[in-house]
């Protein structure tokens, strides 16, 4: 299956009085047509900036550096004029943001906001746009959709607002949907409903999904492949089942071992990842995870490892240079 989106050497920096913040620093990945990719990592790893960079929504003083490449159906989005990008944004590529209450305009009804998106990109009249808005509200499972079209955002629950955001994002039949933490502000029951809705719509509409999240449970539920980000770079990527079963990068392993498991005894301590994510103003010289890694050795602190192929996975760890990472006791032990 051919790739819909190919990102190569994506670098996004924020040029401030305090120095250059390299929030995204050489990211590469691709998404096939109809495929799903999850990008996971702690806060500050560069996940959301990666999504905003693809959409060309990074505000000043940030910028996507010139040697970055974001190829979508043969067009390099990083090189397009703003008017050309505006025809793609919200039309061929749509994005769902983290918090629907702050993403929706409080002074317009939700129906008007969906219809406005349709009119902007589809060049249709008000009647056709309103009909499309009603169709989308029904598609995303909003009950009494015709009545709820006249509601304002504050009159809807968090789950219903997120359904509106999904309906707005899908109103122009995008080929790629970027979902940035789409369930963060929702309770567990509503999270499950939203994830099930997104899976159903993906299968029904045949779109590709780039899912940004810190929740490994969401990743296991939703995606085919996963890319693990740390310190502005991808440190591991591959099929989600293989990464969960046999993580090759110590950071991925640390994320997985910090999750409580069903049936775990309350006396069993969870393993926390020591330390903090380093500042993007001053990334460590070698592997950016080395100061927190239980397996680090001298080379880790002086040389930045590339992604090594490990079967169907790739891992940016010197322990994988010659193949799968050897199972051994952590250096801290």
Describe the function of each predicted region.
Residues 3, 143-146, 237-333:
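Short catalytic/signature loops enriched in Gly
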Residues 4, 13-26, 57-63, 81-84, ...:
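A short, flexible loop at the N-terminus of ABC-type nucleotide-binding domains that lies
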Residues 42, 178-182, 186-268:
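P-loop NTP-binding/switch modules centered on Walker-like glycine-rich loops
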Residues 63, 77-94, 112, 120, ...:
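ABC ATPase NBD coupling module
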Residues 65-76:
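Conserved ABC transporter NBD signature motif
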Residues 123, 127-142, 149-150, 245, ...:
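ABC ATPase nucleotide-binding domain helical subdomain, centered on the C-loop/LSGGQ "ABC signature"
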Residues 171-175:
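A short, proline-enriched helix->beta-strand linker immediately N-terminal to the Walker B motif
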